[in-house]
A protein has these predicted regions:
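Active-site-adjacent structural elements in enzyme catalytic cores
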Residues: 1-340
């Protein structure tokens, strides 16, 4: 299959990309979080192609993307006032809300669940494509299942060139980690996945939010995921990862003392000097969680192009966006974590 590439957001390109979606094709779409692999969320055959192209387990639900909050009532039953309050404050943006699905949303899209995740992405190209197609776009991250998520078009090309009909280059992703997922079918609401919107921002609107156990550990065999990223090993490079948590100075010194020959390092900017001659990827300054979110997937993915036997990674604390960065690193490591 020859993949068509779109660069400029002209009316003609937007319409051509929307036609791919309407015709049941697959389109790589840019968002502020990561690049997505999109298809018509209401077309079961097109949705199946997402799972096949990624090698994604079919019980792993997909998020549907809409251009604005007025579409919530099209695809969700009994939308609570809290959903509209969150949408008014945080949409377009990196927030996915889990709500009861209407029958128009296929069970294939929801991984067999009676709920569906919905978000409005903060990228003008993708919102324009959705509006032109006049259907919601189901889109998980555009990587091969299990690999680090794509944050630029080069990552998409690496994983999906020749496997899908089209790719729209929208530049590098501004946030760099996937959306935060909040389940509004629970009382109190439940955080299923930390992401580009901090938990603290949600609690400022909703009050107390429970944190699902899948944020800190993998679901067990037989447990059904209610949102992407809950059950399966995700975000992983080819080399095994060990995450070291704790005070940044202490974790850096621990890695320095225990780093095996041939291993690579993901560390905060301040501690690169401790690893001369090693393969290093800079996660950003220890205090800059936004920069860490932008860099974490690039750091993990780049090690696939280097001859490292394993990877040791420093980890931020869980305040603000640190919760999302820590979650991605720990999932990449299969929750192989050393606390110092």
């Amino acid at each position: 299959m020859k993949t068509v590439y779109f660069k400029d957001p002209t009316k003609e390109n937007i319409e051509a990309a929307a036609k791919i979606i309407r015709d049941g094709g697959l389109l790589a779409i840019p968002t502020e979080t990561v690049y997505g692999l999109g298809a018509d969320a209401l077309n079961e055959d097109a949705v199946l192609r997402i799972f096949l192209a990624k090698g994604r387990p079919q019980d792993n639900p997909l998020i549907i993307h809409v251009p604005d909050s007025s579409w919530l009532a099209r695809y969700c039953e009994d939308v609570p006032p809290e959903a509209y309050a969150l949408a008014e404050k945080f949409w377009p943006g990196p927030l996915t809300m889990i709500l009861p699905r209407k029958p128009i949303v296929p069970l294939r899209t929801t991984g067999g669940l009676e709920t569906v995740g919905v978000r409005c992405p903060n990228h003008p190209i993708t919102r324009a494509v959705i509006a032109a197609a006049d259907v919601p776009i189901a889109a998980p991250s555009g990587n091969t299942s299990g690999r680090p998520s794509p944050t630029c078009i080069a990552d998409m090309i690496e994983d999906m060139d020749g496997k899908i009909e089209g790719m729209f280059d929208g530049g590098p992703c501004a946030v760099g980690v996937e959306s935060t997922i909040i389940d509004l079918t629970y009382t109190p609401p439940r955080l299923l996945r930390p992401g580009g919107l901090p938990l603290e921002a949600l609690e400022a609107v909703l009050g107390h939010v429970d944190v699902d156990k899948a944020v800190v550990s993998l679901l067990k065999a037989g447990e059904r995921p209610k949102a992407p990223g809950m059950k399966y090993r995700h975000y992983a490079p080819k080399a095994p990862v060990t995450v070291v948590t704790g005070d940044p100075e202490a974790s850096a010194r621990y890695i320095q003392a225990h780093l095996p020959e041939g291993a690579g390092v993901i560390c905060f900017t301040e501690y690169k000097v401790l690893f001369p001659g090693r393969s290093i990827h800079d996660l950003g300054p220890a205090a800059d969680k936004e920069e860490q979110a932008r860099r974490v997937f690039d750091a993990l993915r780049e090690f696939d192009h280097e001859a490292v036997t394993e990877i040791y990674a420093q980890c931020p604390d869980t305040a603000g966006l640190g919760l999302a960065v820590a979650n991605r690193l720990k999932k990449a490591a299969g929750f192989h974590v050393i606390e110092v």
